[in-house]
């Protein structure tokens, strides 16, 4: 456990005041590097095993990769990624997740990380304006444009925040993902479409997921932005 905690601290995770137990709970935002941290731990610890409820790694020759979910391996150090997605059914040494992606009740964490290496400052400003705390750890600036729902073309991967937006896109020959379908995915360019103002969307986890899938450019089409505004790189 000490080795894993040392990795957390080295990667910028911050200790909370929650008393430590024999099961470590770690929370972090999108792009914080938690998957990279898990992979590094697997490389350094032969008895470590990691499983996820989301997108697993492709197998490798060494057998050290994040595997699809199954029960913990006896006599090993077991990590469960995205534990919030399903009820916890077994004992893992580490539970780790981005709880902002889920509506389910989560445990109180021992370590947290609000800093994202993937999301740029403009994206984080937009998320902050919606009451979602994410800090950018990128040195370069990202591109975010805000337009009315008919104010800009669809660029990159489309994500629809509601049924009306999805139906509208489909009518124009565009097959959009819903936020849940995009969990664990990354795209260079994303266009998020909402038929209502982002502040009015009932489930904030859906907004957070949709606005955090891009690596380079985010384009938001919503009726609250009648005139296109651009925050260039």
Swiss-Prot record:
This is Movement and silencing protein TGBp1. Pfam families: Viral_helicase1. GO terms for cellular component: host cell cytoplasm. The keyword Transport applies. Keywords: Host cytoplasm, Host-virus interaction, Inhibition of host innate immune response by virus, RNA-binding, Suppressor of RNA silencing, Transport, Viral immunoevasion, Viral movement protein. It is found in: Host cytoplasm. Homodimer and homooligomer. Interacts with capsid protein. Interacts with host AGO1; this interaction targets the host protein for degradation, thereby suppressing the antiviral RNA silencing. TGBp1, TGBp2 and TGBp3 seem to act together for cell-to-cell propagation. TGBp1 is the main movement protein that physically cross the plasmodesma with the viral genome. TGBp2 and TGBp3 would facilitate TGBp1 function.
